[in-house]
Regions:
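Histidine-centered nuclease catalytic patch
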Residues: 99-133, 147-160, 167
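Short cysteine-rich loop/turn motifs with clustered Cys
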Residues: 80-112, 138
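N-terminal accessory alpha/beta regions
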Residues: 1-75
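Short Cys/His-rich Zn2+-coordinating modules
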Residues: 65-80, 116-123
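Short, flexible, mixed-charge glycine/proline-rich loop motifs
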Residues: 76-88, 126-131
Length: 228
């Protein structure tokens, strides 16, 4: 039981106990809504940033001992690819262009997706095992050159709004794709003949989603994949 593991750890590391958002427990973190996880994340970050480097390392190590992602990563992935658990995984949630759906192998289902942590588990180990902190993504979007350990927004509210695991997330209805001529002399009816004369751009009903487009280089990716 994760709560017992937590209690045992804070007995030997009192500093860790103060790192948890009041009212939250280790077990509740596993299924907490994403908006709650963001509050936990920022509470933890603010707390450890106020500690000395030595005490910060102690808290980080203690938190990692409780929320051991490496020990549970396979179990988490197996849970996500099991259709009976209600998850339907097809394309990368971030770019929607790379097929990451699992497929049947000889003995078990094979996964193609990576379980991206929306909130960086390295900065806050408390959210390392939280179900709503996982986004099935492709290795490109989850790679160090794009998402990596970056945050998806600059403020608490932006991060809550931009996570695909938050019920308020509505990228595909708030962002419209348009194909525009690159040059004024280009005729608008010859896209199929000269796709290199056009570019994909975005119209935002909610401009906060421009941060996702920039973070995942979606304009560059879509233009490279579909118009070049």
């Amino acid at each position: 039981d994760l709560d017992n593991v937590w209690k045992n750890k804070v007995t030997s590391c009192q500093l860790l106990n103060a790192a948890m958002l009041p009212g939250m427990t280790a077990k509740k973190l596993l299924v907490a809504e994403f908006r709650v996880l963001v509050n936990v994340y920022h509470y933890y970050i603010n707390y450890v940033n106020g500690l000395s480097d030595y005490d910060k390392r102690i808290v980080q190590d203690a938190a990692n001992d409780v929320f051991k992602y490496e020990s549970y990563s396979k179990r988490i992935a197996d849970f996500l690819i099991n259709p009976s658990n209600g998850y339907k995984i097809s394309n990368c949630v971030y770019c929607d262009t790379v097929n990451v759906s699992p497929f049947p192998g000889h003995k078990r289902r094979i996964r193609r997706f990576q379980t991206d942590h929306v909130l960086n588990r390295g900065a806050c180990p408390l959210v390392a095992l939280s179900l709503h902190n996982f986004v099935p993504s492709c290795n490109i979007c989850n790679g160090a050159n794009l998402k990596g350990t970056n945050t998806i927004g600059d403020t608490i509210e932006e991060i809550k709004h931009l996570s695909p695991t938050n019920p308020s997330y509505n990228f595909w209805h708030k962002v419209l794709f348009v194909v525009n001529p690159k040059y004024s002399w280009v005729s608008d009816n010859k896209k199929s003949e000269h796709p290199e004369h056009y570019e994909i751009d975005f119209y935002y009903k909610d401009k906060v989603y421009a941060k996702s487009v920039d973070l995942f280089c979606l304009k560059e990716k879509y233009n490279n994949d579909y118009l070049n």
